[in-house]
Regions:
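Conserved signal-transmission helix
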Residues: 1-30
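Conserved glycine-rich
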Residues: 226, 230-233
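Short conserved segment of the HATPase_c
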Residues: 190-201
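Conserved DHp (HisKA) dimerization/phosphotransfer helix of two-component histidine kinases, i.e.
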Residues: 2, 66-116
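Short beta-strand/loop element within the Bergerat-fold HATPase_c
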Residues: 164-177
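Short alpha-helical Gxxx[C/S/T] motif in the catalytic ATP-binding
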Residues: 213, 217
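Conserved catalytic submotifs in the C-terminal HATPase_c
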Residues: 118, 123-133
């Protein structure tokens, strides 16, 4: 699979001449088709295996007591998740834009996330500045990006034992010709040696996950003509924000 840096180099080469652009466009299309085909071919037998396990359980409930039976279920669920995220990553640059009122859109996301952490001790601070644009965007994919970033922040503050209240900040504002959205937390932070790799596919420093969430998020934002960056200082005191992901999308 191509990394983000690979794609950047390919696009630089494509800009050199129409002939190179045509050739590499065909190559990239073929690459995406290969990933889609592989995902499809694996998903079908995996679904059959999962269905067979359910039939076995229904007919023979005693198998639930077999050692590692639950691990088998977990492994299959992981494979299903991996295939879904791989397919999503492959299609990350394909947008279906529609007119999006970002004031309404972001407030709905903030409300949805706040509801999901209501039973935790997390303090969620949302600040949606007035005057946000109404502009074309793929709201479904942007929602996926923002909920992924907020979910990562939630995980970071929950696994980090601190004497301070866990906090997540969600801030959106308009800066000249850009829409800017940031997600910050005072969790564990990201080690400096890991920062350069977190947007690469299959790189993860969590105990669970596929390592495709952040690469997919960056791909979606770049498809909107924007950027997704991160700044983290894990050595700061627990009372301070340690990690901030900043999403910038140009306003037409």
């Amino acid at each position: 699979m191509f990394t983000e840096s690979d794609y950047e180099k390919l696009h630089q080469i494509m800009a050199e001449s129409p002939e190179k652009e045509e050739l590499l466009t065909k190559l990239l299309h073929s690459h995406r088709m290969d990933i889609s085909t592989i995902s499809h071919e694996i998903r079908n037998p995996l679904t059959l295996i999962y269905s067979t396990l359910q039939i076995i359980e229904a007919s023979n409930p005693e198998v639930l007591n077999i050692r590692h039976w639950s691990d088998l279920h977990s492994d299959i669920e992981y494979m299903k998740q991996l295939l879904e995220e791989l397919s999503a990553y492959n299609n990350g640059q394909r947008l279906s834009p529609s007119s999006t009122n970002f004031d309404i859109f972001l407030k709905k996301i903030a409300l949805s996330f706040a509801s999901s952490i209501i039973e935790t001790d997390i303090e969620f601070i949302s600040r949606i500045e007035p005057g946000l644009p109404v502009m074309p965007a793929d709201s479904i994919k942007l929602q996926e990006v923002l909920l992924n970033l907020l979910g990562n922040a939630r995980d970071a503050v929950l696994i980090h034992q601190s004497t301070y209240s866990p906090q997540i900040h969600f801030h959106a504002w308009k800066d000249h010709s850009n829409l800017i959205i940031s997600v910050s937390d005072n969790g564990c932070g990201i080690a400096p040696e890991h920062l350069s790799a977190i947007f690469e596919p299959f790189v993860t420093y969590k105990s669970s996950g596929t390592g495709l969430g952040l690469p997919l998020s960056r791909r979606i934002i770049e498809a909107h003509g924007g950027t997704l960056t991160v700044h983290s200082e894990p050595d700061l005191p627990d009372c301070q924000v340690k990690t901030t992901f900043t999403l910038t999308i140009p306003i037409p």
